[in-house]
Regions:
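Short amphipathic alpha-helix that is part of the acyltransferase structural core
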Residues: 1-41
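Conserved catalytic-core motifs of GNAT/GCN5-like acyltransferases
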Residues: 144-156
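Conserved donor-binding loop and adjoining core beta-sheet/short helix segment
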Residues: 55-98
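Generic recognition of long tandem-repeat/solenoid scaffolds
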Residues: 4, 87, 150-152
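Active-site rim helix/loop that mediates acceptor-substrate recognition in acyltransferases
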Residues: 33-56
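Short glycine-aromatic motifs
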Residues: 2, 55-56, 137-147
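Flexible, charged surface loops at secondary-structure boundaries
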Residues: 51-54, 64, 117-120
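Acyl-donor binding region in acyl/amide transferases
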Residues: 80-140
């Protein structure tokens, strides 16, 4: 079951989590362009956001075994003032069979969407370069009312 990690846990295990996030940030073309080959500053920023006792806008989630790491961030639109939860990064650290993967996706959705509602978010955004996540989202349409949109990145 996916659990929100405490700031203390993040501080004590940051080096381990940082390695997993680096892997996630460089594992696909889109994330690699935005976060790969950059300075270490991105990880300092994330660490500071996750451990700031005065702000709880960024969150790190994990299963007890560390099989999955999910990084989320609350965003507020400058235009509409609506709050949403961005699933910034999600990665698994071990290979699992397809049934387990689908079950974990369902459990993660239940846990994170409950958290988003508690934070007064009006929705959740998830970007992915992986067709698999779009296919999973499509399969949940009946019970999540997911709206699948397209996003484009033109590297400059």
């Amino acid at each position: 079951m996916l659990k929100l990690l405490s700031q203390e846990d993040i501080k004590n295990n940051w080096n381990e989590y940082k390695v997993i996030l680096k892997k996630a940030f460089t594992s696909s073309e889109g994330t690699h362009i935005l976060t790969g080959e950059g300075s270490e500053n991105i990880y300092k920023v994330i660490y500071n956001k996750l451990t700031n006792p005065f702000s709880h806008d960024m969150h790190l989630w994990s299963e007890g075994e560390g099989d999955y790491i999910v990084l989320t961030q609350i965003q507020v639109s400058d235009i509409t003032d609506k709050q949403t939860l961005l699933l910034f990064s999600a990665t698994r650290t071990k290979e699992v069979d397809k049934d387990t993967l689908t079950e974990r996706y369902y459990e993660a959705y239940q846990t994170i969407s409950k958290f988003a509602r508690e934070q007064n978010c009006e929705g959740m955004y998830c970007y992915s370069d992986l067709d698999y996540f779009a296919e999973l989202a499509e399969q949940t349409k009946e019970w999540t009312n997911v709206i699948i949109r397209y996003q484009f990145l033109f590297p400059l």
